């Protein structure tokens, strides 16, 4: 059952990376909330 472990590790790594990028980028999108103009 090594394939299952490897798949789980791969999915976990991709998930963490995707989560990090997803949480890192959005803050730049909601600019209208600041209303600096």
Curated annotation (Swiss-Prot):
SUPFAM superfamilies: Photosystem II reaction center protein T, PsbT. The chain crosses the membrane at residues 3-23. One of its GO terms (cellular component) is photosystem II reaction center. It comes from the Eukaryota. The keyword Thylakoid applies. It is a single-pass membrane protein. It is found in: Plastid, Chloroplast thylakoid membrane. InterPro entries: PSII_PsbT (IPR001743), PSII_PsbT_sf (IPR037268). Coiled coil: none annotated. Keywords: Chloroplast, Membrane, Photosynthesis, Photosystem II, Plastid, Thylakoid, Transmembrane, Transmembrane helix. One of its GO terms (biological process) is photosynthesis. Belongs to the PsbT family. PSII is composed of 1 copy each of membrane proteins PsbA, PsbB, PsbC, PsbD, PsbE, PsbF, PsbH, PsbI, PsbJ, PsbK, PsbL, PsbM, PsbT, PsbY, PsbZ, Psb30/Ycf12, at least 3 peripheral proteins of the oxygen-evolving complex and a large number of cofactors. It forms dimeric complexes. Found at the monomer-monomer interface of the photosystem II (PS II) dimer, plays a role in assembly and dimerization of PSII. PSII is a light-driven water plastoquinone oxidoreductase, using light energy to abstract electrons from H(2)O, generating a proton gradient subsequently used for ATP formation. HAMAP family: PSII_PsbT. This is Photosystem II reaction center protein T. It comes from Cucumis sativus. The lineage of its organism: Eukaryota, Viridiplantae, Streptophyta, Embryophyta, Tracheophyta.
């Amino acid at each position: 059952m090594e394939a299952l472990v490897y798949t789980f590790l791969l999915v976990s790594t991709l998930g963490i990376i995707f989560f990090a990028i997803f949480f890192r980028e959005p803050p730049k999108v909601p600019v209208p909330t600041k209303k600096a103009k």
